[in-house]
Amino acid sequence: MAIRKIIRDLLITKQPLLRQLFHQRVLRANARSEFLPAIGYTSHRRFSVFTEFSKNIRGEAHSNPEFERTVKELKERTEEFKGVTEDLKVRTKQTTEKLYKQADGVWTEAESAAKKVSSSVKDKLSAASEEVKESFKLGKEENAESASSSGTRASQGEKQQSGSTEELHTFFAKFKSSLSSPKVSEVFYRLKEAKPFDIVKQALDIVKDELRGNPSRKKFLEHTPPPPFTGERSMRTEMVVTQTKQSKLQQKWESFREKMQGSPVFKRLSGMSEPVVNKSQEIAEDVREIWETSDNPIVHKIQDMNEKFLKETDSASTYKEIRSRDPSFSLPDFAAEIEEVIKPVLNAYSEGDVETLKKYCSKEVIERCTAERTAYQTHGVLFDNKLLHISEVSVSVTKMMGDSPIIIAKFQTQEIYCVRDENGEIQEGGQDTIHTVYHEWAMQQVETTELGEDAIYPIWRLREMCRNGVQALI
């Protein structure tokens, strides 16, 4: 009991102090709630700086009549704009409905027209088919009657034969009369006039020619002279100088240049610049002469490096010369044409066919072929070789030999190597001996002056041929 009394007295004496502490905590909590954000958890929100700022703006807006008027005008315009947009939506909806209705009407009309056309065509075709069937039935009945009559009247064979021919004539006449109806005859007439089979046949022939035939390209190894000119040639050599038409810009530039040349300032400047230009040209010539005639090893080293890096190569200069003579020259087409010519040239060379060699080879190659041929014949040697395959045709070198360009082509062939004597007996190789032979051809360009007046572009001839090696396969 004494302890309880002591605790009660202590609480009663310290009660004012607890009340003061509680009051301070409440004040601190209120002060914190003023600085909480809008999404805070407090239920009571006091006025802040932003609310006072908004109140000031509202007061100024209410006190300013012009601002209120502009706000009202903006509201009215927004309402008008809303009305216009609604009206536009209604109009677009109406126009789309009209378009859909028109499209449906056109579609229904087209369907009805198509049905009418198809029904009329079906009726016409059915009528024509019925007419043809009736004509066939009539012909069959007449044939059956003629057959029965010929069986019963075997004694009168000649008369029955004449009657059957007459009946056949009547059958074809009736069939022709059935076909002479306006509907069927019109159909056959249209088919005859259209001639679809002829058109299709012509188209197929054109496609076959395009697929089978090679595209027309200029020949580099053959010269085909044009057909002779049958018209009259003019012998007049008069020349008339005609002035070329200038554009407006060129005319203005010419007039401006003439005015500038006539001005005294331009004349004075040109008179002053002429000695300067002449002096600079003299200095440049002196420097060039010193550079070219210098004995300094450093200068020689620089010149060698310049020639090494900046000088045009032999192949480039050769190709440039070829294109200057023949602008339509193409190296891939040239290699393809060489591949086509290899077989006839090698066969003609082994057989001694001079006429074929004249088309593709130079005089030196033909003379070499005839000399080798006569030498082998005197010794009784006969080559029975046969060319099997040609591969790996490529252009290896292009260079100049004097004034004429030279192209060296490489290729390899597979040949049957067989050497016989005068009696036809095999001396070397055999019919089963196959060799791979590596060839090199030197093609030289022939000038147009050597070909004649009709030649426009130069052509190429086989200037030299050699075998680099032979490898036995079988």
From Swiss-Prot:
GO terms for biological process: protein targeting to mitochondrion. Residues 132-165 are annotated as: Disordered. Residues 68-88 form a coiled coil. Keywords: Coiled coil, Membrane, Mitochondrion, Mitochondrion inner membrane, Transit peptide. Residues 132-143 have a biased composition (Basic and acidic residues). Expressed in roots, flowers, young cotyledons and leaves. It holds the Pfam family Tim44. It is found in: Mitochondrion inner membrane. One of its GO terms (cellular component) is TIM23 mitochondrial import inner membrane translocase complex. Residues 145-165 have a biased composition (Polar residues). One of its GO terms (molecular function) is ABC-type protein transporter activity. InterPro entries: NTF2-like_dom_sf, Tim44-like, Tim44-like_dom. Residues 1-54 form a transit peptide. Its main location: mitochondrion. Belongs to the Tim44 family. Probable component of the PAM complex at least composed of a mitochondrial HSP70 protein, TIMM44 and TIMM14. The complex interacts with the TIMM23 component of the TIM17:23 complex. Essential component of the PAM complex, a complex required for the translocation of transit peptide-containing proteins from the inner membrane into the mitochondrial matrix in an ATP-dependent manner. Recruits mitochondrial HSP70 to drive protein translocation into the matrix using ATP as an energy source. This is Mitochondrial import inner membrane translocase subunit TIM44-1. It comes from Arabidopsis thaliana (Mouse-ear cress).
